[in-house]
Structure formats: C-alpha cells, structure tokens
A protein has these predicted regions:
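Catalytic cores of histone-lysine modification enzymes
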Residues: 1-73
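C-terminal SET catalytic tail plus cysteine-rich post-SET Zn-binding segment of SAM-dependent SET-domain
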Residues: 64-154
Length: 154
C-alpha cells in the first residue's frame, strides 16, 4: 500500500503522530495474547493498538526503507529527514523503533542501494545504523544504545 505525501513537507516537518493505549508490560503482553499489536516505547511502557483500528489508520501503511525519508523525533512523533515532495512515498527504517527478537522481514524489497536485505528487530544494535540515525531512534532505543555503547567501551 504505502503512505504518500499529500503536499510538500519540509525537513523536520511533522509527518505522523502515533497514538494508542499506553500500558505496562504485563497489560501489554495480555493484550498481545488477546490479538492486539504492541510496540515498546519505554521501560515498562507499551503502545497497544487494535489491528482493525491500525488498518483503518493510513499512518500504519508507513513502509520500511533502508534509505528512509522520515525518522523519529520522540516516542510518537515522526518527522521528515529531508525535504519531501508531493506524492513522494513516506518511508522509515523500522530499526528506529522495532525492538523484538522475533521480528523479521526475510526479504526487504525497498530497492535502496544501501538495502540490508534482511530486516530484524535487533537491527538497532548495528553500529552503522546507530551512526546513520544518531538520536533519531525512539528515545527508548536511544537510551538502550547509550547503555550498550557504555558497556562496550568499559
């Protein structure tokens, strides 16, 4: 499907503000068991949403690209990484917010020169992506990256 800009968007312009129900881990895992989708946004804080609602919300058609034109500003705000033209597809690298050991896109089809070909829920751990997206992961991942890098340098 995809998500496309209806009008030009300037660099750092707000593209999407996500929303849902915020729950602790126990509640979120129960909701997942009940068929809801969950996204971790902080220690013991999860955004929980219904797949049906998600499918009605065009922002959830935000496709992955290994060379995205949007990135994270904070827990729920996605902004333009650069100027975006009208009708240009809006893309994001899922490494910026997906943290899930079981998450896998086995064959990325983004077509980027920099395509990783396989996308996982642990891509945020890659040093090359940490440098490429510095400070534009979700804040939760930015903190995890900082902690991980401190442990490595110690």
């Amino acid at each position: 499907m995809g998500l496309f800009a209806r009008e030009p968007i300037g660099k750092d312009g707000v593209v999407i503000i996500w929303g849902g129900n915020f729950m602790n881990e126990v509640e979120a895992q129960k909701a997942k068991f009940d068929g809801k989708a969950i996204q971790q946004i902080d220690n013991n804080l999860w955004d929980v949403f219904d797949y049906i609602t998600r499918n009605e919300d065009p922002s959830y058609n935000h496709n992955h690209s290994c060379s995205p034109n949007t990135w994270m500003k904070d827990e729920v705000t996605i902004i333009a990484k650069n100027n975006i033209d009208r009708n240009e597809e809006l893309t994001i690298d899922y490494a910026m917010f997906v943290i899930d050991d079981n998450y896998l896109i086995p064959e990325c089809k983004c077509g980027s020169t920099f395509c990783r070909h396989t996308i996982t829920g642990k891509d945020w751990e890659r040093k090359d992506l940490q440098e490429k997206y510095k400070d534009h992961f979700s804040p939760y991942l930015n903190r995890k990256i900082g902690t991980l890098n401190k442990q490595i340098s110690s």
